[in-house]
Amino acid sequence: MSNFQHGNYHSYYSMRGGTSIIDPRLKCLPDSLFYEASVLDIGCNNGTVSAQIASIFGASFVLGLDIDHVLIQKARKHLEFVSSRIGPVRNPGSIVEDQFNYYPISSIKKFSRIPVQLQPPLNKQNFPHNIEFETADFLRWESKRKFKIILALSVSKWVHLNNHDEGIIKFFGKISSLLETNGVLILEPQGWDSYLKAAKKISVFNQTPENLKIQPDAFEHLLNQAGLVLEYSIEPQVNNSEYKNFAKRTMYIYKKKGIGIIKLLTST
């Protein structure tokens, strides 16, 4: 997998993260959105967002999926590290943000991390036992499980560049097929200028944008065809230091209303 052509940057969150323990994009969303929900995080990278949803936001189950096996290994190590640092749970129904730094990094280095399988449940949803990570190419991955919420944060560009127009259509169709009725897609698409930058930076994509007929401003139409309807969008908080580079992208919240006309593409 050369030149991180799937967006599988191994230092992504250290490069882009701001000052907050919680990912600022999650802070934009309603507190109750993930509570007791089954969640799929497509392109989970090192599992930072997945682990926060499974712990602080009280999801019943979270599956983090990434095409890069090295990142999945990092995600499992990150989960072990994060859960080892969480302090005593005052309220069994939730883990609050300040508990995440309860045990200092120095103590973890001195006494080592606690393997996830040996840790007691830290909240009502059984964290850290309510989260799994899997190496898979989403377009070729099969699942019998459906999800209440699916996240696609800064991954649509990479799906599109690697799999072209047919791939992005299939991507949205497959997301719809994996969502429960009234399930929610949280989409953070990259803009067309980001495609052009990637094409200049990664040689395998040098000619790709000019061969694409679909651009990100057409995604809403494709998602409507897949049975997903835009509920609202969240504009970037450009003056908030917590957001750092994440401030440049809008998130779109879609809800599954029914069976889309491109559902058949998910089985081809």
From Swiss-Prot:
Function comment: Probable RNA methyltransferase.
EC identifiers of the protein: 2.1.1.-
One GO CC term on file: sno(s)RNA-containing ribonucleoprotein complex
Record field: transmembrane: none
InterPro entries membership: Bin3-like, Bin3_C, BIN3_SAM-bd_dom, SAM-dependent_MTases_sf
Source lineage: Eukaryota, Fungi, Dikarya, Ascomycota, Taphrinomycotina
GO biological process: methylation; snRNA modification; snRNA processing; telomere maintenance
Keywords of the record: Methyltransferase, S-adenosyl-L-methionine, Transferase
Stretches assigned to the Bin3-type SAM domain: 23-258
Record-given protein name: Probable RNA methyltransferase C2A9.10
Enzyme kind, highest EC tier: transferase
Family per record: Belongs to the methyltransferase superfamily.
Domain of life: Eukaryota
Organism of this sequence: Schizosaccharomyces pombe (strain 972 / ATCC 24843) (Fission yeast)
Gene Ontology molecular function: O-methyltransferase activity; RNA 5'-gamma-phosphate methyltransferase activity; RNA methyltransferase activity; snoRNA binding; snRNA binding
